[in-house]
Amino acid sequence: MNATEKKRLDKLVRTYRNDLYVKTYKDMAIQSQLDSVVDQVEIQDYFEQNKANFRTNKDLLRGRYVRVSNENNNLRTIRRSLRRFNNTDKVFLDSIALQFTTYSMNDSIWVQSYQFFNRLPLISEKRYKNFLKNNTFFELQDSLEVYLVVIEEVVLRNELAPMEYVKPTLKQILINKRKLELMRQFDREIIEEGFRQKSYELY
């Protein structure tokens, strides 16, 4: 390596090192200033203004189910409680949950339909779309067990996604927007400081 090449390589190394220092400092400075708390109002506003961008590419639903022995002495009460599902019913179902083979009572959470029906082996992937209806109760039975299922609400593919379902995405978008604005602000301050010190180099 001749002297010219060595000089050029040294300059590249210095530039790379300086860029790395600047990037590390920049990342640390931005992270220290970044507010990652996003309130519900901000999420709601962004969602309302950008609804067209949040259409689901999967069928979604909110629902609950119980899988229980068809010889269970409480079967009639379980059926009634699962359908009605008031506070008393919830307490009752929770108190006998050990009698269930499997169950899910968290019907406030939106899930992809195929994930929900995968827990119900009596319903094939081809058949489950027949059950995608709002406020639906149905019952399936094999030789040993009964499947009691309530579908509260359905959102079909290409329809507007529920805000709660896309809430984590909305929150991350808003945090990224804040981060981008901090990066732009940081770059502006670096440029202004460079001009003030007459040490800014244009490439």
Predicted regions and their residues:
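Peptidyl-prolyl cis-trans isomerase
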Residues: M1-Y203
